[in-house]
Amino acid sequence: MNVYEEKDEQLEEFRYQYRERLDQESEFGLERGKKKRTPLPFFSMAIWSLAATAVSVILPLIFGLVSPQQMQDLYTGWALHQSGQIYTDYYGSNGLLYYVLIYLSQGNILFALVEWLALFGAGVFLFKSADALTGQGEQARQLLLVFYLLVGSLGFGGSYAVVVALPFLFYSFSLVADYLDDPSNDKGFLRIGMSLALAFFLSPIPTILFAATLALSLFGFNIAQHRFAHGLYQFFASALGFSLIFYPIGYYTVLTGTFGDAISHTLYPIDTLSLFSNANLMENVAFYGLLSIGVGILTLIFSGLFQTKSAKQSAVSIGASLGLLVTLALLILSKEPLHGSRLAAILPSLTLLLLTNIREGSSDRISRSRRRVRSSSLFGRYLKGNFYLPLVAIVYLLFLPVLSRYISHPTTYQEREQLASLVKQQTSSEDRVYAWDDRPDLYRASERLAPTSLVTPTLYTASDENKTKLMNDLKENQPKMILVNQKVALWSDVESLLSEKYELVQTDSKEFKLYKSK
């Protein structure tokens, strides 16, 4: 019996060694040739991206849950069909191509189609990147699920420019991921620059931060691999690709005479950052800080900076961690009104950190013996590692606008709509009106244009230059009617203007006052 048992053990050992040798030859062949990839889950991506679009765009537009800043962008898309041009007559800190898309969709629900296509494309390139860096197809699918959940919640009712830029950002990262996976393949850096340029003309500041993240990741990887010369080539190739797109599109602003305004508007979020003279600082720290903890940023940054990973994943995780910290700092130091959708700016870096949390291993398509060893679920680790706080944060981000709109301030919205109808009745289509309000809803509802590019006193007025511009525009253009939200503080100059040039219209409103020019 012992002889037979020994022969069986030897035979089993021979079979195991034979399988391992086949696995090694298969891996060697894949490394020498074109590496086999996991098939893309097209159907899942189409459904998940559609669900994320429905939650973040369609529902907010239908039920009036769009953020004030996003409402201003939608107003811009509608108003551009009436008259004027972007940056000169309409204020915005996003890119030119984004406003072209807003214009084509006329600022209405058609924009949902644009976002769905963007999210589908982003999912394709994100899946390819995860598969290239980790070889874990199933984990890459779970990454997509987490990504679409975060898009639906962080992008609920606003920050659509960031979401539309994601496919171009993730396409550039997919090319970087291919290089990190196989350093002998350093092609495609011209396309990286071109893709980043397109993303820049959609959402400038997040694109700059993402480009810096990629540059830092490549720099660290090339230094560690003693490929500094390759890094120089990659930098110049990317810069050339960026220039090929940037200059032709940017030249449009030169032709129209809006180049200076475009630069000023783009840099506004940076120029108005403040630490010591920021009245919103503590509120920003509490709001964005707690939500950041809720979505797991602290644990992801900690693992990104200190957890042991492969060289290629470490390069990405360190760069993404630093990019995420800078993005959070910009949000906390901002003087713009609070809104949960502004956290969508962290999506690019946050997604990269989630990707690097996938434990790298051999793909289940290569070795049967290694199929027995399965890494834990990315989705499960993400939730359990953060004590299920991401679910709490997602629910909070989705229901806070609903509670504000329909429970906390229903009267405010009802009176705003009623007064918009009254304004429409008492003015002609050529008349201009102004909303001294915390939301620019009046213009679309009354089908009237604003007399200034700064359509409310609470958006883009953190700088003295913009405050002066708003006041001068009101004095020079003198809107036919001015709607005043009594909860929004009136500037002294505006009070003087109202008392001298306007008379109060008698209404039943308790929260608004309506003024008409004398």
Predicted regions, residues:
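Short periplasmic/luminal acceptor-recognition loop of GT-C membrane glycosyltransferases, typified by
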Residues: 408-464, 470-493
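Transmembrane-helix signature of polytopic, membrane-embedded enzymes
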Residues: 126-151
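Membrane-interface alpha helices of multi-pass inner-membrane proteins
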Residues: 188-206, 210-215, 326-331
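Hydrophobic/aromatic-rich transmembrane helices and adjacent perimembrane loops
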Residues: 335-379
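Short acidic/glycine- and proline-prone juxtamembrane loop motifs at membrane-interface regions
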Residues: 155-166
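Extracytoplasmic catalytic/substrate-binding loops of multi-pass membrane glycan-assembly enzymes
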Residues: 62-76, 87-101, 257, 411-416
